[in-house]
Amino acid sequence: MSCLPALDKFLQNYHQSYLSTLGELPRYYPRGESSLCIQGEFVEASTEAVGWLPVKREQPGSFTNVEHALELKLWPDIHSFYGQYFAAPVLFDSTWGTGELLQVWNEADFDALQQNIIGHLMMKQKLKQPPTWFIGLLDEGDKMLTVDNADGSVWIEIPGELPSVQLATSLAEFIAALSPRIAPPVKHEELPMPAQDHPGIFASFKRMWHNLTGKR
């Protein structure tokens, strides 16, 4: 079963929760990057957070180029999870802790996401580990949330290691178990990360990289 219905429902609930609780849309620091998600005027030089709404892409994003580059068929949910919307990362509460689901802020962010997924999959090949691809972060970036490319199950994974704890048998099941977390936007500091800099996915991965390398 595709994860898209669960993702649709979570994003709808996410924004409704902010409106019901705070009377406003969730806000996000775009760091000068425009997006169709932004509600209201966008000022590139502004350092303020913006209100945003998820926007369905007219042309869904595809990972066919990644599959061709790696000669690897990706679990179909990757197209639904990352290719259907432009959105900011979304926060959640769960029985496993608090976390963040990664999303794509704009087309440049999607291109950068593909590069980082290729890098992650190449690392798995080098380590002779089964392929996975990431969907988010858990516990303030200490752990990655990944999908097992063989069967679509969702796991906790530390970079460089095998997935350690299975959380759900499918991405749809995992998303359905999450609750929106209401929190003010956080302006993340610039941290070194060996990847192209974009505000959505890589702001989150910079935090994860900083947390992980700082504890090794």
UniProtKB/Swiss-Prot annotation:
HAMAP family: Syd
Family: Belongs to the Syd family.
Coiled-coil segments on the chain, per record: none
Gene Ontology CC: cytoplasmic side of plasma membrane
Name assigned to this protein: Protein Syd
Compartments in which it is found: Cell inner membrane
Principal localisation: membrane
Pfam families from the UniProt entry: Syd
Topology of this chain in the membrane: Peripheral membrane protein
Function: Interacts with the SecY protein in vivo. May bind preferentially to an uncomplexed state of SecY, thus functioning either as a chelating agent for excess SecY in the cell or as a regulatory factor that negatively controls the translocase function.
UniProt keyword list: Cell inner membrane, Cell membrane, Membrane
